[in-house]
């Protein structure tokens, strides 16, 4: 399955809008080749076989193989059965779907609105297939008629075979894709809710496979033509292959690159494409669901589908052609919904006094150029042109500011996005500038002190506000004469200026202004010297030393040291008194501590005498006599002595 090829450069993705407009002779050759290749289609094989072969040729075919000065024809493999089978199957199934839709309309229905639906479908379908019905001008389209006839004859049988391409369930209106609903604006208004979106998706898939197969056959047929200048790169440019996930991303990228290089020619190309897509959409659906096999029809329909995707991406904004025909008021009103952030420096905001006329001229030019740019969406290519505006292309409004009551006027530029300037924003901005520029608040403290200064400042502020409001409103009305919205209307505001004037700081000690004078003079008065000095013009050195050697700080420090010394003395005296009282309390105590000598002396003095034998016998006798007498008392008879 591998093919030999030599790439001349990196493959390019997407297509260029300028490459779609080929010569009429090339288109005739491509049409003849397509008719010849479609006439040799042999049905009977499965269209799923060898799918990766077409994908390899689709993504690996370099666009730069056919250069400007080279007539090299590369060796390509012959057309396979799978490409022919896919073309035949695509045509046959597309015709089957259309015939099933036509047969479904012929079923008798009870409601009148269903009959009106069927009549509207019958009116819309011949318009869609009108390009395929003109077979007298293009004789190679007879093959399509034959395929349609065979498909009709096959579908006239039992209806069970044809129901496999029609979905049983109908998607609700909200569940359909929004992009398809917007793209088919004219048919969405018609009551064709019976047709499901799945049929249209199947038709789109079949058309895409048909375009892939035709591209492969045209690339294979190129080497058989001896003098053909049509190469595979041109064919890649002609056949637009929208992917199902992102239908308009490639086209938008190419439009952005081309608009960066040359914005003016792309504008003409865009206008031409828009007129072409308008003709295609008037002939039928914008999605271009048709069964005509020639390359010119595929090219036109696919181009219209691409432009339909671009329309979907840029909705609900208008393009340059339509927006240039609208009045200035509608463009300004629509631009209120298109917010932009303009970050300008101080140099952009400052305008010289002599450039006022030039600024007005540039303002009118910017208004003319901004009409076509502001109406486009951020995803459209004109967004890049809007970002490349010159810095001086802004609305420059002059605001008069009166300063110091001398009639000196200055101009301040109010820079805002085009179409979004409101009188309230400009008025509030210039009011703040007028209040900050007025020096009455800062200079009236010492010059004016009283109610007269307040009245003069209020009058000056009111005059400034009146002059500014008159000039600012006239500029805004001249800039936006036909504004349809009430958001930017001028609002009258009364600003009152209030000021607080304070007195001198009330300190306890007032320093004399003549404190720096060393000599005794009349400034010191009679507080320090004799009122009638003997020699007032002669000052002795002792007097100067006495006046300058001591300062109030030194005197205060001396007094503080004296007080600290007296406090220290009092603390020492109190400590002595406490110690003396403690000693007195200890000396007057009656308790006496005994020493060892005193204890021995006491024992010696109080020791008893030693006991002798006689004393011991005497004590024994005394002890024996006493108990015996006590025991015999009253029991024994008295003894006779």
From Swiss-Prot:
Biased composition (Low complexity): 374-383, 421-430
Location of region: Disordered: 118-243, 261-289, 355-386, 404-430
The keyword ATP-binding is assigned to this record: no
Keywords, in A-Z order: Phosphoprotein
The keyword Phosphoprotein is annotated on this UniProt entry: yes
Biased composition range(s): Basic and acidic residues: 355-368
Polar residues compositional bias, start-end: 132-162, 222-234, 278-289
Residues that bear Phosphoserine: 112, 198
Cross-referenced InterPro entries: C19orf44-like, DUF4614
Protein name: Uncharacterized protein C19orf44 homolog
Species the sequence originates in: Mus musculus
């Amino acid at each position: 399955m591998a093919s030999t090829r030599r790439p001349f450069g990196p493959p390019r993705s997407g297509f260029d809008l300028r490459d779609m407009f080929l010569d009429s002779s090339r288109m005739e050759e491509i049409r003849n080749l397509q008719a010849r290749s479609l006439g040799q289609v042999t049905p009977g094989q499965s269209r799923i076989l060898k799918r990766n072969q077409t994908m390899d040729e689709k993504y690996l075919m370099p666009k730069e193989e056919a250069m400007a000065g080279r007539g090299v024809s590369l060796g390509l493999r012959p057309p396979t059965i799978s490409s022919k089978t896919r073309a035949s199957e695509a045509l046959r199934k597309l015709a089957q779907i259309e015939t099933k839709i036509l047969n479904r309309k012929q079923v008798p229905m009870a409601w009148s609105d269903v009959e009106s639906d069927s009549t509207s479908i019958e009116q819309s379908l011949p318009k869609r297939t009108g390009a395929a019905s003109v077979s007298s001008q293009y004789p190679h389209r007879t093959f399509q008629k034959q395929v349609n006839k065979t498909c009709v004859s096959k579908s006239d049988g039992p209806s069970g075979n044809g129901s496999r391409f029609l979905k049983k369930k109908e998607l609700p209106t909200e569940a359909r894709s929004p992009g398809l609903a917007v793209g088919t604006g004219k048919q969405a208004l018609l009551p064709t809710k019976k047709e499901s979106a799945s049929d249209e998706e199947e038709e789109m898939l079949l058309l895409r496979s048909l375009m892939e197969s035709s591209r492969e056959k045209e690339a294979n047929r190129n080497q058989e033509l001896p003098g053909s200048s049509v190469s595979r790169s041109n064919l890649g440019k002609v056949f637009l292959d929208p992917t199902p996930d992102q239908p308009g991303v490639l086209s938008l990228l190419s439009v952005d690159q081309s608009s960066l290089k040359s914005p003016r020619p792309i504008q003409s190309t865009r206008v031409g494409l828009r007129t072409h897509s308008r003709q295609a959409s008037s002939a039928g659906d914008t999605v271009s669901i048709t069964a005509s096999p020639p390359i010119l029809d595929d090219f036109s329909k696919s181009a219209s589908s691409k432009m339909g995707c671009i329309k979907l991406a840029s909705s609900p904004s208008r393009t340059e052609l339509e927006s240039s025909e609208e009045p200035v008021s509608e463009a300004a009103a629509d631009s209120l919904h298109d917010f932009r952030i303009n970050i300008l420096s101080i140099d952009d905001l400052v305008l010289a006094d002599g450039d006022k006329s030039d600024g007005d001229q540039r303002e009118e030019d910017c208004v003319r150029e901004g009409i076509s740019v502001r109406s486009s969406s951020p995803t459209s290519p004109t967004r890049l042109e809007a970002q490349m505006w010159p810095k001086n292309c802004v609305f420059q409004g002059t605001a008069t500011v009166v300063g110091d009551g001398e009639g000196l006027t200055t101009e301040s530029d109010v820079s805002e996005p085009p179409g979004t300037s409101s009188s309230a924003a400009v008025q509030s901005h210039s009011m703040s500038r007028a209040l900050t520029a007025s020096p009455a608040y800062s200079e009236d403290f010492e010059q004016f002190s009283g109610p007269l200064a307040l009245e003069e400042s209020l009058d000056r502020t009111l005059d400034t506000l009146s002059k500014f409001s008159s000039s600012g409103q006239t500029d805004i009305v001249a800039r936006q004469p036909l504004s349809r919205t009430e958001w930017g209307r001028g609002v009258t505001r009364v600003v009152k200026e209030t000021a607080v004037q304070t007195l001198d700081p009330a300190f306890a000690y007032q320093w004399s202004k003549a404190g720096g004078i060393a000599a005794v003079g009349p400034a010191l008065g009679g507080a320090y010297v004799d009122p009638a000095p003997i020699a007032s013009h002669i000052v002795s050195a002792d007097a100067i030393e006495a006046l300058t050697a001591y300062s109030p700080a030194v005197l205060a420090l001396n007094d503080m040291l004296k007080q600290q010394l007296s406090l220290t003395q009092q603390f020492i005296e109190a400590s002595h008194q406490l110690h003396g009282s403690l000693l007195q309390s200890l000396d007057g105590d009656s308790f006496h501590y005994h020493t060892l000598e005193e204890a021995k002396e006491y024992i010696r003095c109080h020791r008893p005498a030693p006991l002798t034998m006689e004393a011991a016998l005497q004590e024994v006798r005394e002890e024996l006599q006493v108990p015996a007498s006590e025991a015999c008392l009253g029991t024994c008879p008295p003894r006779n002595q």
